[in-house]
């Protein structure tokens, strides 16, 4: 009887110990970075003068959602409600002009070529930003995800069914 009790006690203790051990979630320091911090800037007052850059360390370029018009130094402003494209940039700050820049904008439905008209409504609740990736689902159901490479970017676009699709 004593041997059975000892066996049951050892097995019970092992089960209790196993249930207490939790798997540690692996976080990298980069997972604590919020690229949207500092993006609520205006011409009158700066709250950071940043944009949500997606890049790799020492990469040749950055990628960012673009809420401002082409030619505007204010590429992304948190208070805007339209995304006009996803911009390849070399711009380190809104105070320094950019060069060699272009935008890519996936659209569904009606094709709009004018950058002033092609903005698509979005909500920050449908936006995910990290230093290594950005994704947004637009009000029309179109979803765009991007990740940077050392010399470019990889896009994944999910279009709504039964609508015209453009990039």
What are the residue ranges of the model-derived segments?
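Bacterial N-terminal signal peptides that target proteins for export
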Residues: 1-9
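C-terminal motif of bacterial Sec signal peptides marking the signal peptidase cleavage site
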Residues: 18-19
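Intrinsic disorder/low-complexity segments enriched in polar/small residues
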Residues: 4, 23-24
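Accessory carbohydrate-recognition regions in carbohydrate-active enzymes
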Residues: 24-167
């Amino acid at each position: 009887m004593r041997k059975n009790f000892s066996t049951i006690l050892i097995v019970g203790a092992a089960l209790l110990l196993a249930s207490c051990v939790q798997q540690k979630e692996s976080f990298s320091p980069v997972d604590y970075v919020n690229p949207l911090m500092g993006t609520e800037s205006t011409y009158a007052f700066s709250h950071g003068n940043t944009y949500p850059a997606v890049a790799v360390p020492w990469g040749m370029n950055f990628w960012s959602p673009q809420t401002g018009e082409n030619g505007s130094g204010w590429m992304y402003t948190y208070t805007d409600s339209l995304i006009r494209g996803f911009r390849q940039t070399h711009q380190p700050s809104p105070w320094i002009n950019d060069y060699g820049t272009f935008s890519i904008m996936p659209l569904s439905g009606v094709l709009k070529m004018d950058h002033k008209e092609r903005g698509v409504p979005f909500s920050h609740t449908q936006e995910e930003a990290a230093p290594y990736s950005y994704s947004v689902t637009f009000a029309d159901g179109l979803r765009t995800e991007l990740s940077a490479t050392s010399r470019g970017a990889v896009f994944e676009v999910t279009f709504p069914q039964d609508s015209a699709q453009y990039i």
